[in-house]
């Protein structure tokens, strides 16, 4: 499910748009105030994705500019970094519905760098945690402190030893579906 707009909620519940809009924002505020901020533990998947990418390239090659240069990049470009905790083996054994991610911590940054990833991991992941990532050099800073395992997405989605960061990739799949299909525009706030 990609989310419900205020207009759709107003039709479903039978209230006007303003009432549905206020209800959605009150729900969002309540979720934010009562979220679980304890450290993630055991097995965690981490990854980053960029939103507000470069605009569409010009048709003619001579009119195109190099968007890799900082002065040509979109000023609103941001990196969303997610850390998702798996259910433990014991939790899965007790309840067969405990599959996928147990909790998620999401951070908005300017870029996916070693300093940013290091500070995020320090704030939200226990030191004994096992972190699964892709082979981005930004996550190399985690090697001395955490049990870091990587998968090379250029060659495979799941390594032969079972390492995958599919929970983080799943989050971004749903996030982008919400971004393009429901919200259409996101402010950086």
Predicted regions and their residues:
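Residue-level recognition of single "structural anchor" positions
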Residues: 1-189
